[in-house]
A protein has these predicted regions:
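Core dinuclear metal-dependent hydrolase active-site scaffold
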Residues: 1-42, 89-149, 161-166, 212-220
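Hydrophobic/aromatic beta-strand patches that form the interior of the parallel beta-sheet core
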Residues: 10, 46-48, 75, 90, ...
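Catalytic metal-binding/acid-base residues of hydrolase active sites
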Residues: 53, 80, 111, 143, ...
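A short helix->loop->beta-strand "cap" motif at the edges of active sites that frequently abuts
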Residues: 24, 68-73, 174-178, 204-206
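Active-site metal-binding motif and surrounding structural segment of the metallo-beta-lactamase
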Residues: 32-76, 151-154, 175
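Binuclear metal-ion centers of metallo-dependent hydrolases, dominated by the metallo-beta-lactamase
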Residues: 10, 85-99, 168, 178-220
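Short internal beta-strands
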Residues: 71-79, 178-185
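A short, conserved beta-to-alpha structural element at the edge of catalytic cores
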Residues: 82-84, 162-175
Length: 220
């Protein structure tokens, strides 16, 4: 848990984030790139899924995760709610606010980024989380929606729909105090600086924190 009014942010692989305050634990996007121990977590107050793609929700292992956290609020976009057949999921939408413990979760946006025009855009609802006076934004798979007042931005760094210039522009538009990378297991170690260094050099964030797949940081 975080202490002294800080928020603890832990990466758990690719797009999965565990956000903790003294009172509340929120897990976001437990997908196929996560190790098995992520799906054995307990004591969660909320489980959030931004969209249906398997790198954001591993349906097979997610069943055990939800069963291990029977009191957790489970939030997801409307299309994912129609697809999952385990647990009780609450639909998250753009602008909808949900309070869990000392955390307020607000839905941001509605559609996934375009991968190729021939593919339909699935639903995608990012989350702006207010905790301990800090606002944390995780957009899911899109750069389209830019909320105001973001302290910490978890920026998707690499995917079939991303482009480095658009990543940099998105960070510039959000203008966070701190930026950290997520959605990056599609990038090789050798190529990683080609993406992350551009965010550092050109994104304009106050601070850039490079977290490994199992690393944590604390934000006052």
């Amino acid at each position: 848990m975080a202490h002294d009014g800080q928020v603890k942010i832990t990466r758990l692989g690719h797009a999965a984030i565990l956000l903790e305050t003294d009172r509340t634990r929120v897990l976001i996007d437990p997908g196929a790139f996560c190790a098995d121990d992520v799906f054995a977590l307990s004591g969660l107050d909320a489980i959030i899924v931004t969209h249906q793609h398997p790198d954001h929700l591993d349906v097979e292992r997610g069943t055990a995760l939800v069963a291990a956290n029977p009191d957790a609020v489970c939030l997801c976009d409307p299309e994912t709610a129609d697809l999952v057949d385990f647990g009780t999921w609450t639909i998250n939408r753009d602008g909808l606010e949900t309070r869990v413990g000392d955390v307020v979760i607000r839905g941001v946006g509605s559609r996934h980024a375009v991968i190729v025009p021939q593919m339909p855009r699935v639903a995608n609802v990012g989350v702006l989380i207010e905790a301990e006076g800090t606002s944390y934004f995780q957009p899911g798979d899109t750069y389209e929606y830019v909320p105001e007042g973001v302290d910490v931005l978890a920026v998707p760094l690499g995917a079939p729909w991303t482009k480095v210039s658009e990543t940099v522009e998105f960070v510039q538009q959000v203008a966070p105090r701190i930026v950290l990378p997520i959605h990056d297991l599609t990038i090789s170690e050798l190529a990683y600086p080609m993406y992350w260094e551009r965010v550092i050099e050109l994104g304009g964030a106050g601070e850039a924190r490079l977290l490994g797949q199992r690393e944590s940081t604390r934000v006052p």
